[in-house]
Structure formats: C-alpha cells, structure tokens
C-alpha cells in the first residue's frame, strides 16, 4: 500500500485525509510484518483448549436474562474462553461472576449501529472500564465512513482507543463488512488501525450478514501483523471457525462457542 497514504492517515494532523484517494484491493502489498495464518490455525485447532482460548464467548441478545449471563460466565470459566462478551447492562454481573478467575469481561460500546455521539462513546467506555471490563468492542461510525467523513471516523475510534489503552484494555473495532464495499472495508480498517484499534472485527451480527473467509482474508491482507482480526457473526460450527482461522482470524466471536469447542473434543 502506498506509504504516502499511510503517512497521511497516521499523522496527528488529520487534514491530509481529505485528499487521499480511495484505497483499492489492488493497492494491497503484504509488507506489514508476517502473520502466518496457516500455522496459527493449525496450532489453534490442535485441541479444544487452544481453540477456546481464542473465542469470545458472546451473549448480546436484547432479551438476555441475568441467569443466561451467569451461565455464560460459568461456561467461560469451564472452557477458558478468551473473554465473556456482554451488553453493558450486564457488565457488572459478569465482572462479579468472573472475579479472580483470570477470564476477562468484554462489553460492547456504540452498539450495534455505531451511530452514537463521541461523547456518549467515551462515557460508555469509561463507565465499563470502571466496572472492570477489559475488552471493548465498538462499532465504527458506518454512515460517516460511507459518507467519506474520514476525520470523524478516525476521531471516534481514537477517542475509544485512548480510554481503553490508558487503562490497559483492548479495543476491537467492528467494521460491519456486510454493509461496506471492498474499498470501504480497506479504508475503514486502515483508519481504525491508525486510530489505535487492537483488532478489526467483521460484524456485529445485527446487520444481516456475518463473517466470511473472504472478508477476513481481505482485512488480514491489509492489516498484516499490525493488529488482530476478529471474525464474528454467524459462526455456529467448527467448520465455520476453521475456515475463518485459516483465512487469517486470530479471534472468534460466537454465541455457539461451547458447541464449536465440543466438536473438536472434550474439555
């Protein structure tokens, strides 16, 4: 990818963004450090424990109950999932349930549409981190990205990243790939990385489309080893997870986590 474009994205002065031409798939050069997807997938799929360690055990249904959240946390402890991912209203419950277990709590912000004010996003992030959340999954301002307002996209992601990183938390940025063109996926991913994203995430699961191996490979090709790639949305089987890991994902978000891990063997 043209380094002049990257320099413009990454500088503190954001005005050059307006003059940057759209990023196309043909611009990709795999020169950001190697991520060996094949080796990572082979290691991760070597056993149920290794697979569980890269899965965000997720419950984001609007009608989720306390009992279901507590069950999610019990499963996260038993299977040693990467984290338990919940809606903000259940963050305190999850933090209490997972205290002292070594399993972190994740929660969503600006979810599921990415259409909140930056001030609201900051407040959500700060409140959740105070509760003990250690992984934040936000949704990129999709409409701003599609409108070409790259300053707003960068500012929004950077605001959340600064809060997360100040407290040692991770930030995953959902692009909602089902709603984006190839150029928008690449542009959104590049902006998110340079604004501080620790992971690019494919989907919220609420926009009519989920993770595909093609989108994961596209994001990994653009990101290289600069950040993680989280595949989420519609992942229900071990075959789904395998295809996405082999395409370049190093984190999976799923509500069918237990069933996926059990397909690989007993824990």
Please provide the spans of the model-predicted regions.
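Charged, compositionally biased N-terminal leader segments and the immediate start
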Residues: 1-55
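Alpha/beta enzyme core
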Residues: 40-79, 83, 89-96, 100-229, ...
